[in-house]
Regions:
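Positively charged, solvent-exposed patches that mediate nucleic-acid binding
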Residues: 1-114
């Protein structure tokens, strides 16, 4: 995922957490906020309490990033995906499905924004 398509700084995440629309599922929580970049920007959060080891945490983050890459999000949105406990043992297919369903719910709630 290109650098321009990622949320990188703390204030970018803070804005999405404070003002974004929350879409919760059993595996992930999406926070979606319109942006002015002209393309989607993604952020991923996997907590240390959820996955204590760095290897497992980064593995889950990579899997979420790939699921997001394969999901269609064509509009200008900041999207933060936060892993939930069920995501640890979920298959990649389940993670991809959860991301896709979350984005389609976001599109409906934003009036066709994703």
């Amino acid at each position: 995922m290109d650098r321009q398509h990622r949320l990188r700084k703390g204030p970018e995440f803070d804005t999405a957490y404070a003002q974004g629309t929350v879409i919760a599922g059993p595996l992930i929580v999406l926070r979606v906020l319109p942006n002015s970049a002209g393309h989607p920007r993604w952020g991923f959060a996997v907590g240390k309490k959820l996955v204590p080891g760095a290897v497992g945490r980064n593995r889950l983050r990579r899997r979420l990033r790939e699921a997001a890459r394969l999901s269609p999000a064509s509009e200008s949105l900041d999207i933060v995906i936060t892993a939930r406990r069920g995501a640890i043992d979920a298959s990649f297919r389940d993670l991809s499905r959860a991301v896709g369903q979350g984005l389609s719910r976001a599109a409906r709630s934003e009036g066709g924004a994703a």
